[in-house]
């Protein structure tokens, strides 16, 4: 389940209606993935890059650049948020958004569609106010709820500075508005969800809030 892409989808504003979330796994054949994207003839393709898919994405972006030369290719995700210019996949993309792209992806899409592309390839997303973010949980489909892991998060960031962990760079710690988060969780429960997987770096940092949840 691509949790991050659902955040982007939920926060696209007016562009949400003309955007499609298409998910694949590392077990899918690259040619099949390419064909699924190409047949949609998108104006913009956004791809989440992680340690486990960076090799496949590098090949995919190269193929997309060849087959869809007029399509904007935008990358994001942890694998391209900290080391950018050194990676081959970055060189082949039009843009890379580093950090929390909830609003930055929408803003970039708006500029690209308006014919006003930014000059720089790497776009550093600011730290968004979590109260301004549309929660992504309505983007979970009935099929997702029946067959996929349901990821949730009540906070972002980590107060610790462990040298071995990239989460040390995700500061400061911020909480989503608790009442809004709990209401979204109740909606998921009403839809049949009985198991939640929290992705918070430090869920129990605020014991009062974690106990309430």
Where does each model-flagged region fall?
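Glycine-rich beta-alpha loop elements in corrinoid/cobalamin-binding modules
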Residues: 8-11, 15-131
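Radical SAM [4Fe-4S] cluster-binding motif and immediate context
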Residues: 131-213
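Glycine- and acidic-residue-enriched helix-capping/strand-helix junction motifs
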Residues: 1-5
């Amino acid at each position: 389940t691509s949790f991050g892409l659902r955040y982007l989808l939920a926060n696209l504003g007016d562009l949400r209606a003309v955007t499609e979330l298409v998910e694949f796994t590392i077990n899918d054949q690259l040619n099949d993935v390419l064909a699924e994207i190409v047949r949609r003839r998108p104006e913009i393709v956004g791809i989440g890059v992680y340690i486990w898919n960076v090799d496949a994405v590098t090949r995919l972006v190269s193929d997309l650049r060849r087959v869809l030369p007029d399509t904007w290719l935008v990358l994001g995700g942890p694998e391209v948020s900290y080391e950018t210019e050194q990676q081959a996949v970055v060189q082949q993309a039009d843009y890379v958004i580093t950090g929390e792209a909830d609003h930055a992806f929408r803003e970039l899409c708006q500029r690209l569609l308006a014919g006003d592309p930014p000059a720089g390839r790497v776009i550093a997303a600011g730290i968004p106010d979590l109260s301004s973010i549309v929660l992504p949980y309505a983007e979970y489909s009935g099929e997702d709820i029946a067959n996929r892991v349901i990821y949730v998060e009540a906070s972002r960031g980590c107060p610790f500075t462990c040298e071995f962990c990239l989460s040390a760079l995700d500061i400061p710690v911020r909480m989503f508005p608790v009442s809004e988060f709990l209401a979204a969780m109740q909606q998921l429960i009403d839809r049949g969800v009985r198991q939640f997987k929290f992705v918070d770096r430090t869920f129990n940092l605020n014991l009062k809030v974690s106990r309430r949840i």
